[in-house]
Amino acid sequence: MQLKIKEIFNQDYVKLEGQKIQIKAWVRSNRDSKKIGFLVLNDGSSLTNLQAVYRVDKIDNYEEIAAARMWAAVVIEGVIKLTPTAKQPLELEVLNAQILKQSDEDFLLSNNDLNLETLRLNAHLRPRTNLFHAIMKVRATLAFAVHEFMNQNEYSWLAAPLFTGNDAEGAGETFSIQKFDNEEFFGKQTHLSVTGQLQAEAYAQAFGNVYTFGPTFRAEKSHTNRHLAEFWMIEPEMAFVDLKGMQDIVEDLVKHVIKAVLEKNQQELEFLAQRNDENLIKKLQKVVESKFERIEYKDAVKILADAVKNGHQFENNEIFFGMDLGSEHERYMCETYHQGPVFLQNYPKDIKAFYMKLNDDQQTVASTDLLIPGVGELVGGSQREDSYEKLLKRCQELKMPIESLQWYLDLRRFGYYMSSGFGIGFERLVMYVTGVNNIKDTIPFPRSHGQIEF
C-alpha cells in the first residue's frame, strides 16, 4: 500500500511492523558504505523524515540508488521495521527502489550555511527547507481557519476587484496602471487596489455580513522587515454592528485562527519555537486564553507621557494628543503596560481615514487598532460614517475626488444605517504566529521595492 510519511508516524507503530508499503518522496540525504546505504526521505506531508535502509544483497540497482543526490525524486517499496533503541522509532527496509528524477550536483540547498537573505533570493527553492515548510504549513492553516470562522458565522465571501479608480486610504501610495495604446484602458486613471473595503461596504448593505480575503498592493519604497508591496488582507464588513460589536468579532476571529494552529500544527510550532522563539507556544496560548483590554486613545497618550516622565526612553519622546503613535509606543502599550492584546480606540480624526464615523466630541472617530505583543498593530478597524452630509464634508476637507467616490457616498442615501469593519494584514498575522522577524519570510514569493523575481 502507498502511504504518506505523516500517515506512518501518526499511527500505532506496532501494527505497521512487517507491512509492505510504497513511498514516493525526495531524498534529503544519502550515505552508503558499499554494502549498505541509508536514504533520508521526505514527501512534504510532515517535517519528520523517514529513513530507508538499502542493502547490496537486497536490491539489483544498489549503485544507482547510492548515487541518488539530495532532492532526487524516488519511489521506494519496503517493509516497516521497528527500531525502538534508535533515534527514530522505525525505518523502511528497502525491497525495490527507483530514481524517478535525479537532482543536479549544484543544488543550492546542499550548502548548509545558507542564510535567510540568500533564501529570499532563491524563493523558488526555500520551501524545501524545514523552516519555510513549517512557516507555509502554518500560513495554510491560518488561511483555512479564516474561511472556516467566516463560514461558521454566515459571512459571504466577496471577490473584491484588484483594479480601482479609488484610493480608499487617501495615502496616495498606489500603483498606477500604464496607458494601453496611448489611452486609458478603463477610460480614467486606474490603480491596483489597496483595499476591498469600499466594495465590501456596498455588499454588506445587502448581505449583512461579508468579507474579502485576497491580495492588495501598496507602493511604499520601504526596505524594513515589516512592509511588502503585495500582501494579503482579511477585511470583514458587518451591517448593524457598532465599534464595540466589531471589536468582539475581531477578538473571536483572532482567537479562532490561533487556536486552529495550536491544534493542527503542533509539530511545526515546536520546530519554530526552537528556531525563532522558545516561548512561542506559551505566547499563543496566552492570547487564546486572555481577554483583550480596551483603552481610549487619549488615555494611552497619558500613559505614554507618564512613562516618559518616569524615565522611559522612546526614540520619539514627544507625546501629545493628536500624534500618530509609532510602533515603539504601540508595543509599550501591549508589552509593558498591559502585557497582552489591547484595543486602542477613538483616535483623533486627523490621523485616521476619511470614512470613519465622527464621534460626538467632533475630534475623534469611532476607530480601533488591536495591538499584539511582539508585533504592535495587527488589526485596524472602525465604525463607518453613515451620514451623507458628514462624509461629504470630510471628503471636501481632505480635497478628495468627489466624482470618483460619488457611488460610495450614495450608499448613505439608501438605508445605510450602520456598518463596521476591520482589516488584518495576513502576513503580519503569520509573522506573529510563527515568530519570524521578517515579513518577507511569511509569503511564498515576496514583492517589495526593487524585488520582483519569480
UniProtKB/Swiss-Prot annotation:
Pfam families: tRNA-synt_2, tRNA_anti-codon. One of its GO terms (molecular function) is asparagine-tRNA ligase activity. It is found in: Cytoplasm. Gene3D superfamilies: Bira Bifunctional Protein, Domain 2, Nucleic acid-binding proteins. The keyword Thylakoid does not apply. The keyword Ligase applies. It catalyses: tRNA(Asn) + L-asparagine + ATP = L-asparaginyl-tRNA(Asn) + AMP + diphosphate + H(+). CDD domains: AsxRS_core (cd00776), EcAsnRS_like_N (cd04318). It comes from the Bacteria. Homodimer. PANTHER family: ASPARAGINE--TRNA LIGASE, MITOCHONDRIAL-RELATED, ASPARTYL/LYSYL-TRNA SYNTHETASE. This is Asparagine--tRNA ligase. It comes from Ureaplasma parvum serovar 3 (strain ATCC 700970).
